[in-house]
């Protein structure tokens, strides 16, 4: 974990409104974050935002990351191309909790088209507050890199 517990945010146009809502959640908790974009609802290419976030998480400059796009799939696929990234597509609190407990996910990905603000609040809080269990789960994570 980065000592500053900074959060990296990447958002595609379908997640822009949810991005602004998530920033309010983070602000209310006094958590610092770096917003990697986008800054509007205009169409954009998610890899242009995903790669800088992934590199920042890998370098320890921000931790954890939060990414939002329409379905969440494209940005999750892009993020997971990076060796040090375990991006988890989550749309419910329990999925986010398990992604942290069992998979030590370091980037939360949410589908902007398919998650309400209420569920996003619970999902973000679960992701930020759930520790990794380690043990047998660490053994499995150690087998991920090629």
Question: How would you describe each model-predicted region?
Answer:
Residues 32-43:
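A short beta-strand-loop structural module common to alpha/beta enzyme folds
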Residues 29-34, 62:
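A generic structural motif
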Residues 1-11:
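Single conserved hydrophobic/aromatic residue that forms the stacking wall/gate
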Residues 67-113:
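Mid-chain, well-packed structural core segment of small domains
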Residues 9, 13-29:
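Glycine-rich phosphate/diphosphate-binding loop of Rossmann-like nucleotide-binding domains
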Residues 14-17, 93-146:
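C-terminal binding/interaction regions
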């Amino acid at each position: 974990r980065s000592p500053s517990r900074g959060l990296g945010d990447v958002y595609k146009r379908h997640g822009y409104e949810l991005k602004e809502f998530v920033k309010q959640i983070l602000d209310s908790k006094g958590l610092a974050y770096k917003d990697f974009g986008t800054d509007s609802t205009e169409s954009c290419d998610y890899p242009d935002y995903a790669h800088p976030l992934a590199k920042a998480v890998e370098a320890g400059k921000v931790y954890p990351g939060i990414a939002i796009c329409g379905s969440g799939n494209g940005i999750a696929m892009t993020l997971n191309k990076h060796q040090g990234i375990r991006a988890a597509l989550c749309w419910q609190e329990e999925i986010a909790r398990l992604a942290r407990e069992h998979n030590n996910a370091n980037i939360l990905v949410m589908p902007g088209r398919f998650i309400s603000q209420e569920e996003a609040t619970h999902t973000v809080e679960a992701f930020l507050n759930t520790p990794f269990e380690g043990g047998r789960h660490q053994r499995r994570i150690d087998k991920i890199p090629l």
